[in-house]
Amino acid sequence: MAASLSFKDPFVVPLGKEDLVEKARFELAGDSRSDHLMMANVFMKWEYHVKQGTSRSFCYDYFLSESILKMLDHHKSQFAEHLHTMHFIGAANPKHRSANMNSDNEALVRAIVCAGLYPNVARIKKIRRNRAYGGSHESKCTVIMQTQGEHHVELHPKSVNNLANGQFKYQWMTYHLKMRSTKVH
């Protein structure tokens, strides 16, 4: 996750396929409803497909840039070396069991992400349902959040939480950065 925060997004968005990319992101997020955990899932699945020799088709199917994933993997290895040097983990290899003892504990991983990104925490204030879009019966929602410095922040359009239909397990979210465009995301 840390490597993905410091580098570009591995998703490629071909013209006219924005909805398919959005659905691929949502599928890769699973039921985590987290952009951060989605990136961890992307890495785990990509590493599996690298071992199987099917990484190119995986990347093609999910609109991922394999070259960016390789760069992120390199960053991940560098982070692991630094953590090993500081004696935070027992091995310099990020895939070593001792470096992943709690990787299956989603609650702990969420707590670590929150602590690492603090004070970048937002509270969901309101969920506004929008009318049906794209001719389907699905309806997107506008999620309005409050952060420490802003009273009206909306989810970025690329967030996997945009397809959550306003169903959230928690009323709090963490974020890496805020962007101002026509709205604050």
What are the roles of these predicted feature ranges?
Residues M1-H185:
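Second RecA-like catalytic domain
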